[in-house]
From Swiss-Prot:
Gene Ontology MF, one: NADH dehydrogenase (ubiquinone) activity
Protein name (record): NADH-ubiquinone oxidoreductase chain 1
Keyword Transmembrane helix: yes
Localization per Swiss-Prot or TrEMBL: Mitochondrion inner membrane
Catalysis performed (reactions): a ubiquinone + NADH + 5 H(+)(in) = a ubiquinol + NAD(+) + 4 H(+)(out)
UniProt keywords, alphabetically: Electron transport, Membrane, Mitochondrion, Mitochondrion inner membrane, NAD, Respiratory chain, Translocase, Transmembrane, Transmembrane helix, Transport, Ubiquinone
Transmembrane segments annotated in the record for this chain: 7-27, 46-66, 78-98, 113-133, 151-171, 183-203, 239-259, 262-282, 296-316
Keyword Transmembrane helix (UniProt): yes
Membrane topology according to the record: Multi-pass membrane protein
Protein family: Belongs to the complex I subunit 1 family.
HAMAP family: NDH1_NuoH
Main location: mitochondrion
GO biological process terms, semicolon-separated: aerobic respiration
Taxonomic path: Eukaryota, Amoebozoa, Evosea, Eumycetozoa, Dictyostelia
């Protein structure tokens, strides 16, 4: 009985640490994005709330939460309420297997990579439910686009991750990092890194692949009918996934935190800055161009890379 109580308390504290850490990370990721984009566009960015604008995310979050929650009359109220909670919950669950040290992880799972692939594949359900429950044509089209986009690019991303698993000989995230003590995987698998980066942009609905929430076409897309806490949960889920993808790319190709925690954090921030750089640089793709790129360009190249990695491993052995 005491052991069970200890496990429950330990699990609750770990979950609380993950949630608080994630909220702080998302807050500063949004501030970093606004500062970097301001610098690229030769302007100041937020600099009024707090020292050099450091408290701006807190002010924005409080303003958003304190606003009135407006539920459309024609919406399916239960599913409308569940959708943002589901999206945010999935983004938190994904973080449970991310190591914060070589021997320090909240949920040590031997097949951590498979766990991430499985959970991330159901992340689209929150967006689809939001689009359907809002009973709005713009939200519904945004949900459909998101479903098609994630299915199209998860195949290519899955093949690249299979290539990493094959090359490393393990599906454990910590062991993948340990295998990069001498040589980072980005050196032998540079084409795979480029494809994984493009797929990560698409999976997180980031520009130039932000078709599900294209303002010019869908008036913010799947979350057009959401306000206050619902909108905030979608926002938190989206940025939590962006940070997760930045960390995963660092773990898979740059060695993660295997040598130094500070260096590992810098790698993750560097990947996050590359997401921001792409947003500030490239225009949005058309929907047909997005589908063409996914099925006729990325998928064949990902398959070739996977075959090449298998051949390389067989030759080495």
């Amino acid at each position: 009985m005491e052991n069970m109580l200890y496990i429950i308390i330990e699990g609750g504290l770990k979950s609380l640490i993950v949630i608080i850490g994630l909220l702080i990370g998302v807050a500063f990721a949004t501030l970093l994005e606004r500062k970097v984009m301001a610098a690229m566009q030769k302007r100041r960015g937020p600099n009024v709330v707090g020292f050099v604008g450091l408290l701006q995310p807190l002010a924005d979050g409080l303003k958003l939460v304190l606003k009135e929650t407006i539920i459309p009359i024609v919406a399916d109220k239960l599913i409308y309420a569940i959708a943002p909670i589901l999206t945010f919950t999935i983004s938190i669950v994904l973080w449970s297997v991310i190591a914060v040290g070589v021997q320090s992880v909240f949920a040590s799972i031997n097949s951590g990579v498979i766990f991430i692939l499985a959970i991330s594949s159901i992340g689209v359900y929150g967006i689809i439910l939001a689009g359907w429950a809002s009973n709005s044509k713009y939200a519904f089209l945004g949900g459909l686009r998101s479903a098609a986009q994630m299915v199209s690019y998860e195949v290519a991303l899955g093949l690249i991750i299979l290539s990493i698993i094959t090359y490393a000989g393990t599906v454990n995230l910590q062991e993948i990092m340990e295998n990069q003590e001498k040589v980072w995987f980005i050196i032998p698998l540079l084409p795979g890194f480029l494809l994984a980066f493009i797929s990560a942009l698409t999976e997180t609905n980031r520009p130039p692949f932000d078709l599900p929430e294209a303002e010019a076409e869908l008036v913010s897309g799947y979350n057009v009918e959401y306000s206050s806490t619902g909108f905030a949960l979608f926002f938190l889920g989206e940025y939590a996934n962006i940070i997760l993808m930045s960390v995963l790319l660092s773990v898979f190709f740059l060695g993660g935190i295997v040598s130094n925690k500070i260096l590992g954090a810098m790698k993750g921030v560097g990947m996050l800055c590359s997401f921001i750089w792409v947003r500030a640089t490239l225009p949005r793709y058309r929907y047909d161009q997005l589908m063409y790129l996914g099925w006729k360009s990325l998928l064949p190249f990902a398959l070739l890379i996977y075959i090449g990695v298998i051949s390389m491993v067989l030759i080495i052995k």
